[in-house]
Curated annotation (Swiss-Prot):
GO terms for biological process: cell morphogenesis; cell wall organization; lipid A biosynthetic process; peptidoglycan biosynthetic process; regulation of cell shape; UDP-N-acetylglucosamine biosynthetic process. Residues 263-492 are annotated as: N-acetyltransferase. Residues 461-492 are annotated as: Disordered. It comes from Mycobacterium leprae (strain TN). In the N-terminal section; belongs to the N-acetylglucosamine-1-phosphate uridyltransferase family. This is Bifunctional protein GlmU. Pfam families: Hexapep, NTP_transf_3. Homotrimer. SUPFAM superfamilies: Nucleotide-diphospho-sugar transferases (SSF53448), Trimeric LpxA-like enzymes (SSF51161). GO terms for molecular function: glucosamine-1-phosphate N-acetyltransferase activity; magnesium ion binding; UDP-N-acetylglucosamine diphosphorylase activity. Mg(2+) binds at D114, N239. Residues 242-262 are annotated as: Linker. UDP-N-acetyl-alpha-D-glucosamine binds at residues 12-15, 26, 83, 88-89, 112-114, 151, 166, 181, 239, 344, 362, 377, 388.
Length: 492
């Protein structure tokens, strides 16, 4: 989206966010996989403004590097302005303007870093409305049934915007007003600069309010315009953990609905959480209790869940993933994972492969058609195509100093309870017996067996645990066995 004339956007993110009661700066709290500030900057970037400035104050040392990272991600310049003291929103805008070129003469859009649902379309409509009029400012408004904490819109009898009164300074009758300031404005920069120098701190909070610019411009006879939006969630701010949870749920509801409309079956939207950067293919079914996080990508015709959490996982088409926790892994087409499977970073499961119940994998490649059906740890390993790893096997990858790799060839069959002591290689087509500890390479086609013949120590329990329940049971069994042997030896 681009507009005639120049556009600069100031994002106010200098406040301490004390009501969050958090060591994390408010604008860095996350919703749907992005920080609130990241949501704002993603939306603004779609407008392609000539200038984008983030105004920082509290904890600016922590936030500024993340702004730089977002600038790289979004492939655009984002300037940072510093508000050295918390003197109010009017002062924050004054600081933000200092980051613009002295000869900049376009419009200035002001928004905040704690309205994560504010989208590019809403901003674009505000700018278009402002460009179509001769107003000095166009303010975005909305209506809340409970407008606690929001500045109220005061209108004349002709329904023109007269002023904005902050909640703390509002009279009881003014607090009954339900139309509120959304905290988003489009200003003529000349009018804005002229009004900012007239601000004073004669208010309850002793701050320079940006909202006072409205009444100043009005008194000067300049036109003040307003644009009302019905969808108040788009401009709802976050000041505490309750509001954070409420907006998280609302954004998730919208994300889920978007996927449903696009052809994804989501059995229970109320228990399904999907981050904003997740993609899901057509005809995939998402079962209850599923979380798809980060940049997870799900192909077409997959079955995911129930009770599954995937973070930055790539799932190819027609795969099934049940009751699985996975991070930074890849699941091939037609593969089957779960239940109760743990995919740690670096896991790559090939086409039609299988990772079954109580299997944990890490930094390993499991080839096409290979199977690890149950009760196994696979760490730092490469398993060839169509191999089968027996139950209770362990890839012993740590030698006390560093992680070592194990290589399993194709079409290998390993017995239950096999231990692979890395570094070790098992050749194509080889077998291992149950309980084998593989310490040396196994040639292709060989059978590896390391278990010695079984040795039974007769009457050990009676001697070592005399009088115990086990000894008594053994004695009875021996007596029965003796009688049966005697009966067999007697002639008919």
């Amino acid at each position: 989206m681009t507009f005639r004339g120049d556009t600069a956007v100031l994002v106010l993110a200098a406040g301490p966010g004390s009501r969050m009661r958090s060591d994390t700066p408010k604008v860095l709290h996350t919703i749907a996989g992005r920080s609130m500030l990241s949501h704002s900057l993603h939306a603004i970037t779609k407008l392609a403004p000539q200038h984008l400035v983030v105004v920082l104050g509290h904890e600016h040392q922590r936030i500024a590097p993340l702004v730089a990272e977002l600038a790289d991600t979004l492939e655009r310049t984002i300037d940072v302005a510093l508000q050295d003291r918390p003197r109010g929103t009017g002062h924050a805008v004054f600081c933000g303007l200092s980051a613009l070129p002295d000869d900049y003469g376009g419009i200035v859009v002001v928004t905040s870093g704690d309205t994560p649902l504010l989208d590019a379309n809403t901003l674009a409509e505000l700018i278009a409305t402002h460009n179509a009029t001769s107003a000095a400012v166009t303010v975005l408004t909305t209506t809340f049934s409970d407008p606690l904490g929001y500045g109220r819109i005061l209108r004349t009898q002709d329904n023109e915007v007269m002023a904005i009164i902050e909640h703390a300074d509002a009279s009881p009758s003014q607090r009954e007003i339900r139309e509120v300031n959304a905290g988003v404005y489009a200003f003529d920069i000349t009018a804005l600069r002229s009004a900012l120098i007239r601000l004073n701190s004669n208010n309850t909070q002793q701050e320079l309010y940006l909202t006072d610019v409205i009444s100043i411009l009005r008194r000067e006879g300049q036109k003040v315009n307003a644009q009302h939006i019905d969808d108040n969630a788009l401009v709802a701010g976050v000041n505490n953990r309750v509001q954070l949870a409420e907006l998280s749920a609302e954004l998730n509801r919208r994300i889920v609905a978007t996927h449903q409309v696009a052809g994804v079956t989501i059995i229970d939207p109320a228990t399904t959480w999907i981050d904003i950067d997740v993609t899901i293919g057509n005809d995939t079914v998402i079962h209850p209790g599923t979380q798809l996080l980060g940049r997870t990508q799900i192909g077409e015709c997959c079955v995911i869940g129930p009770d599954t959490t995937l973070t930055d996982v790539l799932v190819s088409q027609r795969a099934t993933v049940v009751r699985t926790h996975g991070t930074s892994s890849t699941i091939g087409a037609g593969a089957m994972v779960g239940p109760f499977t743990y995919l740690r970073p670096g896991t790559v499961l090939g086409t039609k492969g299988k990772l079954g119940a109580f299997v944990e994998t890490k930094n390993s490649t499991i080839g096409t058609g290979a199977k690890v059906p149950h009760l196994t740890y696979v760490g730092d390993a490469d398993i060839g195509e169509h191999s089968n790893i027996g139950a209770s096997s362990v890839f012993v990858n740590y030698d006390g100093t560093a992680k070592q790799r194990t290589t399993i060839g194709s079409h290998v069959r390993t017995g239950s309870d096999t231990k692979f002591v890395a570094p070790v290689t098992v050749g194509d087509g080889a077998y291992t017996g149950a309980g084998t500890v593989v310490r040396n390479d196994v040639p292709p086609g060989a059978l590896a067996v390391s278990v010695s013949p079984q040795r039974n120590i007769e009457n050990w329990v009676q001697r070592k645990r005399p009088g115990s329940a086990a000894a008594q049971a053994a004695e009875k069994a021996s007596t029965r066995t003796g009688k049966q042997s005697q009966q067999k030896s007697e002639p008919d």
